[in-house]
Amino acid sequence: MRKNIVAGNWKMNKTLQEGIALAKELNEALANEKPNCDVIICTPFIHLASVTPLVDAAKIGVGAENCADKASGAYTGEVSAEMVASTGAKYVILGHSERRAYYGETVAILEEKVKLALANGLTPIFCIGEVLEEREANKQNEVVAAQMESVFSLSAEDFSKIILAYEPVWAIGTGKTASPEQAQEIHAFIRSIVADKYGKEIADNTSILYGGSCKPSNAKELFSNPDVDGGLIGGAALKVSDFKGIIDAFNA
């Protein structure tokens, strides 16, 4: 059965001390609650080893925002999936639009990253989505289907371990949001191509998150769609009251 998930993506924010404080604050905010969704925080690498033991693992999962496409070796500045896993982190965001746009991550590179993450026991949160020009040209389905090739090389067993996140790139950090109807339409399309590849059962069990200016004021409406299983949250994840407001959308 697929899960409802609210995952925070801190991006390149928070010093070590600030990150520890934010994680502690979130942990305290959820201390006496039982959220109706899985809660995940994905942090910069420097926070992982400190934050993971601080939070209640029964309520908050911890993940990285990226990992290398190589297992180990002379790759200065890179952090491997094995290293991420050694901190106790359980998740890793892969294929975020910022990584694709600014760091040239391709279908082939992401295919390697996904395989290494899975081999080291990490759950990939695999991101897909179109830019404004592609949306205006009505090419969003074509773009998303091409991006999914990075994970469609996986066995059915491995694919069933990943989480998908649809992010309309034109809505990230812009204040624009896909309408609930737009979100449902493309989430349903994504689920349909998963079903075509792996069958209806795996498709029905795959969590597909929405990532694009999701906030407490619109989360409930977005999450009420049958194919929207939660959110990948950027800016709102840096403020506990906002992040908890989104988590609470599943309690309303």
UniProtKB/Swiss-Prot annotation:
Superkingdom of source: Bacteria
Alphabetical list of InterPro entries matching this protein: Aldolase_TIM, TIM_sf, TrioseP_Isoase_bac/euk, Triosephosphate_isomerase, Triosephosphate_isomerase_AS
Catalytic activity: D-glyceraldehyde 3-phosphate = dihydroxyacetone phosphate
Subcellular locations according to the entry: Cytoplasm
Active-site feature positions: H96 (electrophile), E167 (proton acceptor)
Recorded metabolic or biological pathway in which this protein acts: Carbohydrate biosynthesis; gluconeogenesis; Carbohydrate degradation; glycolysis; D-glyceraldehyde 3-phosphate from glycerone phosphate: step 1/1
Residues reported to bind substrate: N9, W10, K11, G173, S213, G234, G235
Main location: cytoplasm
Gene Ontology terms: cellular component: cytosol
E.C. code: 5.3.1.1
A Pfam family it matches: TIM
EC top class, as a word: isomerase
GO molecular function, one term: triose-phosphate isomerase activity
HAMAP family to which the protein is assigned, alphabetical: TIM_B
Oligomer status and interactors: Homodimer.
Function in brief: Involved in the gluconeogenesis. Catalyzes stereospecifically the conversion of dihydroxyacetone phosphate (DHAP) to D-glyceraldehyde-3-phosphate (G3P).
Protein name as annotated: Triosephosphate isomerase
Originating species: Bacteroides thetaiotaomicron (strain ATCC 29148 / DSM 2079 / JCM 5827 / CCUG 10774 / NCTC 10582 / VPI-5482 / E50)
Origin organism lineage: Bacteria, Pseudomonadati, Bacteroidota, Bacteroidia, Bacteroidales
